[in-house]
Regions:
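Hydrophobic alpha-helical segments
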Residues: 1-192
């Protein structure tokens, strides 16, 4: 289906149900700030789960958020090959392995994922990792289902940094009227 066939999709954004938008914002503000797991790892996990799920919109958002956190473009690009990249520690790889598996389907997660996680993380930290993956799954499904038109700042970043590793905006392009006006950080939905 061509992007132009998603007529009126901007009318399906969460802000048209203000109570839902506010509750989702509360959840984002609870899950994403650093606690036992820092913000960078949380955004790496979110972006990895979005890569596995195939939501191009969330891939651009997660990557742009990593950029806003000061993560080098090379590390963001290396997420596409994290298993062999020297940019990532064994602890990060364990978290990203879970994110990729759960991002595909929870049924893909294996006991070995938890064996590796427990080498690096406490139970509380693993719960945080799971929360990021679960919230990411909700956002992936919402945004990919309605083919959200990605904001320009995220698109500009993704075109520059992600396109060289195979990213494209897919169905998440459209008219200026349909386009989101900014990244969630810009709107205060989530803190940097």
């Amino acid at each position: 289906m061509a992007a132009t066939e998603y007529e009126g999709r901007q009318n399906l954004e969460m802000h048209h149900w203000p109570e839902l938008r506010e509750k989702v914002n509360e959840l984002l503000r609870l899950v994403f700030p650093g606690r036992g797991i820092d913000g960078e790892l949380k955004q790496l996990i979110f972006t990895a789960a979005s890569l596995a799920r195939g939501c191009l919109h969330c891939q651009s958002h997660g990557s742009y958020h990593l950029h806003k956190l000061g993560v080098a473009d090379e590390k963001i690009q290396a997420l596409w090959s994290y298993r062999t990249s020297p940019e990532f520690s064994d602890a990060e790889r364990a978290a990203l392995d879970l994110a990729f598996a759960a991002g595909i389907s929870p049924n893909v997660v294996e006991p070995e994922n938890y064996v590796e996680l427990r080498k690096h993380y406490s139970n509380d930290q693993i719960i945080e990792i799971l929360a990021v993956i679960a919230v990411g799954g909700f956002l992936n499904r919402w945004n990919d289902t309605i083919a959200t038109v990605t904001d320009q700042e995220s698109i500009d970043f993704a075109e520059r940094v992600l396109r060289p590793v195979g990213w494209n905006s897919g169905k998440h392009t459209g008219s200026a009227e349909e386009q989101r006006k900014g990244h969630p950080i810009t709107f205060g939905y989530i803190d940097k």
